[in-house]
Regions:
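A glycine-rich, hydrophobic loop/mini-helix early in the fold
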Residues: 25-32
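Core segments of cupin and vicinal oxygen chelate
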Residues: 1-24, 65, 73
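Active-site donor-binding loop signature of nucleotide-sugar glycosyltransferases
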Residues: 19, 30, 97
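Short, structured motif recognition centered on aromatic/hydrophobic residues
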Residues: 26, 46, 93-95
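Vicinal oxygen chelate
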Residues: 14-21, 37-111
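Short, surface-exposed linear segments at secondary-structure transitions and domain or protein termini
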Residues: 35-40, 104-107
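A cross-kingdom feature marking solvent-exposed beta-strand/loop segments within repeated
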Residues: 33-37, 72-73
Length: 111
């Protein structure tokens, strides 16, 4: 699994790690503060759901045709592409396409 530290996650340092295996995991992060609100806030609780898809670009097109707007792109990475959608109740969905079968490359957060 992956894990690491971000010195400035929207104004606060956090540490995080994956619980699971190379193909299915839950990401746990520190830095929680206060009640659950928008995903960019600093709260203890559920941040987002990640779903692996075979083709992110095709997904973006399908969701756009269905009326869903892209919230933001993930960071550029050689072994994955991810996008995020925010639904009306504040739940963030991450859709991720992997370009590698190797867990160490899929879950590399140093690139």
């Amino acid at each position: 699994g992956g894990g690491g530290k971000i010195d400035n996650w929207f104004g606060r340092p956090i540490e995080w790690f994956h619980v699971g295996d190379d193909h299915s995991y839950i990401a746990i992060s520190s830095g929680g503060k206060g009640d659950a609100t928008h995903w960019t806030s600093h709260f203890t609780g559920f941040k987002h759901i990640g779903i692996v898809v075979p083709d992110v670009e095709a997904l973006i097109e399908r969701l756009s045709k269905a009326g869903y707007e892209l919230d933001h792109l993930g960071d550029e990475h050689p072994f994955r592409k991810n996008v995020y959608y925010l639904e009306d109740h504040g739940m963030l969905f991450e859709f991720i396409e992997y370009f590698s079968e190797k867990g160490c490359e899929r879950n590399d957060y140093i690139q």
